[in-house]
């Protein structure tokens, strides 16, 4: 638990587990830190044959709406996300931050044209989604699946073991290693 972090819902500052245990209040603004404020890390996966993310990201590199098909109750504003493409060139292609809590909402109109099967758009009416703000896009130097499989710190990631799905939890150890390897790929 010592590497757990909490994000204050009011001021947005990140608080260490030690600070959380000692006081339960944000040292920056005084807001009570509930256990739900625990910062989490995720992989959000897309299938390029179903959603043309690479085309989409060329048009808008700022924000994007994503389904939270699994873990909607665990995903929160402020959590960090690695964007993973499935398929032949599977791997991490972007890093982002969730900027909304999960909610039921129609798919943003500008995203509709990137779905190869327009019937898939209905999922946004029935399931929860979040908006992600992209912090780093690494299309030209992704962290590929084979690199993750070879790395002892990443080889047990859920997206590698059971790759069917949209959302996968990451540990802080996974997250830090992903960032480290992305920086080495520069």
Give the positions of each predicted feature.
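Aromatic- and Lys/Arg-enriched surface recognition patch
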Residues: 97-168
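Short Cys/His-rich zinc-binding micro-motifs
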Residues: 10-18
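Short, Lys/Arg- and Gly-enriched loop/turn segments at beta-strand edges
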Residues: 89-95
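Residues immediately within or flanking Cys/His clusters that coordinate Zn2+
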Residues: 5, 23
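Compositionally biased, charged N-terminal/linker segments
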Residues: 17, 24, 31, 36-77, ...
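Short cysteine-rich clusters marking metal-coordination/redox-active sites
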Residues: 8-11, 26-29
